[in-house]
Amino acid sequence: MARFTLPRDLYHGKGSLENLKTLTGKKAIVVVGGGSMKRNGFLDKAVDYLKEAGMEVRLFENVEPDPSVETVMKGAAAMTEFQPDWIVAMGGGSPIDAAKAMWIKYEYPDITFEEMCKVFGMPKLRRKAHFCAISSTSGTATEVTAFAVITDYEKGIKYPLADFEITPDVAIVDPDLAETMPQKLVAHTGMDAMTHAIEAYVSTANCDFTDPLALYAIKTVSYTH
């Protein structure tokens, strides 16, 4: 038996960021990285759309590349204080991965990081909040997956978090965001996308649903100049 899990809703195409207005809730916390979303005006747009949806909004900013356990704990503490019913992660893989881990800790304050790392052994989420991921790069695809990577810098180890529970409820893939990437990042994330597509096709966990997507992704990346 196999399982193929994707976000409930995947909004894509230019201008799809506007679909934040369709979310229903009272409070949203927006998790972002180093500042590109703010510099390019997308963070302000996201906040405005969430407020238009009737939500109070708070920011958790400056998630570093390869997010740390410490950042996860700080973000979870901010969520516990604010009590959002939507977690909106915006940017590349790092802020989205960090927000997934924060989400677990927010829903289960007593859980340890070691317990969070138990593969496909997480408790049920969505008791307090739902999750929306907005990607700004082409590579990680964490906006549609059941995975995240968090770094313990004291041990010098990157830990994968893996469970269908951390698959986002909503994903927004708006090319307006990706078009602001520097040329070097376009190249790096393009290789990342190609690698993930090849991995998916040769994986022992592949299935009839994943193979066509993987093959099409390989062709699309290889034909893009």
Give the residues covered by each predicted segment.
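ATP/NTP phosphate-donor binding region
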Residues: 1-86
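Conserved active-site and cofactor/substrate-binding residues in soluble primary-metabolism enzymes
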Residues: 15, 37, 41, 45, ...
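Buried hydrophobic packing segments
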Residues: 75, 98-103, 197-198, 218-221
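FAD-binding core of FAD-dependent oxidoreductases
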Residues: 88-100, 136-140
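Short Gly/Thr/Asp-enriched flexible loops that form oxyanion-binding sites at enzyme active sites
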Residues: 95-108, 144
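A glycine/threonine-rich phosphate-anchoring loop and its flanking beta-alpha core
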Residues: 108-208
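Conserved small/polar residues in nucleotide/adenosyl-binding loops
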Residues: 224-225
